[in-house]
């Protein structure tokens, strides 16, 4: 893609350009935000580094691409919410205007490079602006380990003390310290290169937890040279230092030195540029313990001998959630009109319950023919328009199921927050992770959904995790053979999201497979992940065991991007907030759903219940399988109406529809051991 690089002059924005080039993107312009008062170096902007802005004009000459700049005033960070929405007179709107101007002048602009490492504040703002302009964010440094990243930067940097004697080093990366504001750093460090600073920063990190890449504002840098500076570099002439208490600044005096750097040198440096492997070291160990499955076994036919009975839309309140399930339409023939009917019905339900759309936490989308995904997704996106209803769209699982009735193109179910409903544009009680930029970290969202959502006032932080498939994050292409690796990658992405948000306790898990031949690989992958790797690899020693039984495996018709497996589910940060022994007996005795099942003495195979408790308030998350229609009907009838059931079933089974159940038609379903069952249940109470 053709991209503009947002640059501050610092190491991160330029090092990200390096990775954009590594991933075959084309740099066509530079963009910069600077202080309106030209003599002012530091605006204390929440968003932009402005120290050293007076050198920015040189970079256009060094690289040979146009530079676009726009000024901002001091104290214009008017919207400091983590998840940004367009706000009049905020400094971010200057970035919007800058990029809009560039896009008008360069219509084939496709992407924006940004050097964010840990700052969600910066990331969400750039993503908001780019989303409004139809641009892709390229943020290859996002969530990188800082010590590892600094080591790579130093590896690619020149030896400033030996440039004359090292011809291979002379044109490499060169970033200098221009500001320090941390314990252990002072004016003597100003002007130092990254390799000179690395041991200092490592020591300060061990002693005082100083961020090695300066993500806490400990230091700022200015780049003088890089392998893609093909037309010139900045020669350091002098360093003018000044101090204000514990903050020390340097104004660099430089001279532009023209040169014609061969493209072969850049290509050589790109070849040497370290890139994170697709699998983390621990996940690489896991793949090596699995037998490799190279390809699918062949086309599988699904015979549609099913009931055309259509479950009614159900609305069920469980604790602080409203479950709106089985939204379908048969009023219209086209997929677009059916989709519009569904979202009209959903809008009416929300309106009648006085619930804004920004309170939708999670969505499950079944599509009969995945070739219609684009049409449905367009209407879905319009319904959840972030510019109207605020940031953090619902998490989502989207799969193809030919088990829907022949004249039904799509089915939608949603989970809605019913606490603190109001007319605010932003649901401030809604937390989430919505990463839209490409990186090495995990896939960006490929639709209008968040990777995860939760409620901020939930002490357990019960979180809804979007379905994850085996996409290579930096390219957003599906991983090829062996298929085992694609399955492991999908689960790694799920685990990465859980680790990032700190919600690693698994409550309910679903794995969708589009080809039954991968069933054994999925089972082994799940077993190794949950506990078996602890005994096989030191890299897994710190991981707590997960409960295998919470998994329901379902065979469906198709997955996005032709994937063979997708992992999604519900997790939480902590199972018990007030761990009080005196309360445990009371919790067990008041376990309504479990008590019902015990009294019924039913043969629910693989039954597993996880109780989440906070301040005497209990929630149950139950997984189970049933092979008797009579026992299923008894369960559906006797389960308290305050509980929400998701029923996985093949529609050829004739069942009675109930009013507190989300029906999920699938071809086949299995437990965590791979045993096939007639019915699978996920129950929340």
Curated annotation (Swiss-Prot):
Q: Which cysteines are joined by disulfide bonds?
A: none
Identify the metabolic or biological route this protein is part of.
Protein modification; peptidyl-diphthamide biosynthesis
InterPro entries, per this entry? Diphthami_syn_dom, DPH6/MJ0570, Rossmann-like_a/b/a_fold, RutC-like_sf, YjgF/YER057c/UK114
Instruction: State the similarity comment.
Output: In the C-terminal section; belongs to the RutC family. In the N-terminal section; belongs to the Diphthine--ammonia ligase family.
**GO CC terms in record:** cytoplasm
Tell me the Gene Ontology biological-process terms attached to this UniProt entry.
protein histidyl modification to diphthamide
- Please state where this protein is localized: Cytoplasm
Q: What does the further note read?
A: Present with 2270 molecules/cell in log phase SD medium.
Which protein, by its recorded name, is this? Diphthine--ammonia ligase
**Domain of life of the source:** Eukaryota
Annotated EC: 6.3.1.14
Q: What class of enzyme is it?
A: ligase
Can you state the subunit structure given in the record?
A: Interacts with elongation factor 2 (eEF-2; EFT1 or EFT2).
Q: Which species is this UniProt entry from? A: Saccharomyces cerevisiae (strain ATCC 204508 / S288c)
Key word Ligase present: yes
Tell me, in a sentence or two, what this protein's role is. Amidase that catalyzes the last step of diphthamide biosynthesis using ammonium and ATP. Diphthamide biosynthesis consists in the conversion of an L-histidine residue in the translation elongation factor eEF-2 (EFT1 or EFT2) to diphthamide.
Knockout phenotype, as recorded, reads: Resistance to sordarin.
Give GO MF terms, alphabetically: ATP binding; diphthine-ammonia ligase activity
